[in-house]
């Protein structure tokens, strides 16, 4: 498998609070992660870095992730450890109040491919010449679209399109939305909401 990542602050922001990693464990299973930090005093960078550092180092030390069920449990257990660490950091560093991060990840083994997300960073697969979105954004506008209260074509220009309904560092317990995907794909793409 070929893998790479690109990160760029873009034209709007002076600095980038995204963190990204691609790691292999001891049996060659792959974990890909993008985390988009938020919060003042560069706290977003701290939060997003906590995600990729914690998950990446623990995954790299595994001999195997095991079954799909084992993988989901491992991911949620580690996501909640990270979430607790972010909340603790905020408590100990009041200047970082409001700190948090989104996370989107893909886990590829010889037997399965799963995606997981919290927030509005997205996961896609490229298959048969088309890009397919896998994850669902945790935003107010997306909830309104799913509830039938807002037309999809109105979502892009809605004044509250950037209101996140879920992120690490905002609640005491978090659960990844997990998506089981056919592993026979041409490419996997993860991105923060800033990709245009």
Residue spans for each PLM region:
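PP2C/PPM-type serine/threonine phosphatase catalytic domain
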Residues: 1-196
């Amino acid at each position: 498998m070929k893998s790479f990542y690109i990160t760029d602050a873009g034209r709007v922001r002076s600095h980038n609070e995204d963190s990204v990693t691609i790691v292999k464990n001891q049996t060659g299973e792959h974990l890909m992660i993008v985390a988009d930090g938020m919060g003042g005093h560069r706290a977003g960078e701290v939060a997003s870095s906590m995600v990729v550092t914690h998950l990446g180092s623990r995954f790299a030390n595994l001999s195997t992730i095991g079954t799909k069920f084992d993988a989901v449990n491992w991911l949620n257990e580690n996501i909640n450890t990270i979430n607790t660490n972010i909340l603790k950091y905020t408590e100990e560093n009041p200047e970082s109040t409001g700190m948090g991060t989104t996370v989107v990840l893909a886990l590829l083994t010889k037997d399965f491919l799963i995606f997981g997300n919290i927030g509005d960073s997205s996961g896609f697969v490229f298959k048969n010449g088309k890009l397919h979105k896998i994850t669902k954004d945790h935003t107010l506008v997306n909830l309104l679209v799913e509830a039938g209260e807002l037309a999809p074509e109105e979502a892009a220009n809605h004044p509250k399109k950037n209101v996140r309904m879920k992120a690490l560092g905002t609640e005491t317990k978090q659960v990844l939305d997990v998506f089981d995907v056919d592993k026979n794909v041409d490419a996997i793409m993860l991105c923060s909401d800033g990709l245009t």
